[in-house]
Amino acid sequence: MSPWKKSVLTAFIPQAIKAIVKDEIKDAKLSSLFADHSLMHPKDKKIVLFSVPGAFTPTCSAKHLPGFLTYASAFKEKKVDEIVCLSVNDPFVMKAWCDANKAGNDILFLADGNASLSKAMGLTFDGSMYSLGVRSQRFAMILTGLKVEKLFIEKPGVFDVSSAQKVLGHLS
């Protein structure tokens, strides 16, 4: 048995992820520690994915993640099958961030360690001047299967349109 708790799934996002092309994520192959997870079979699943520049960073830890934790049950009421948090960190950092925030089964934490998915979507920025390297921009998206229904991209240094409350307001 893996030392990872089943409630805390971390995953690698391999180089096989190509891009969002015509509003659909193509070849989104996730290798995870738990093969039975819904993201392994996303067809017909409603997924809310939000991306943060980094685990344990100020805005991500104080505002972005807590909003999705607070409204997790409201997302489930809106028939969202999975809430996913993506960050350019390694899976061990993502697990520690999940544990530190007592996220349990509410949010799936995915590590985009080499920024493969973020780069493929064209949603990265260079944080080298802050000793962060390449990071994902702050954004959120609503997906049905792998089709992107809505995409909310933040301007640099801003936290607004990708908040849990704003995303929740776009779900019918």
Features from the language model and the residues they span:
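Chalcogenol-based redox active-site neighborhoods
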Residues: M1-S172
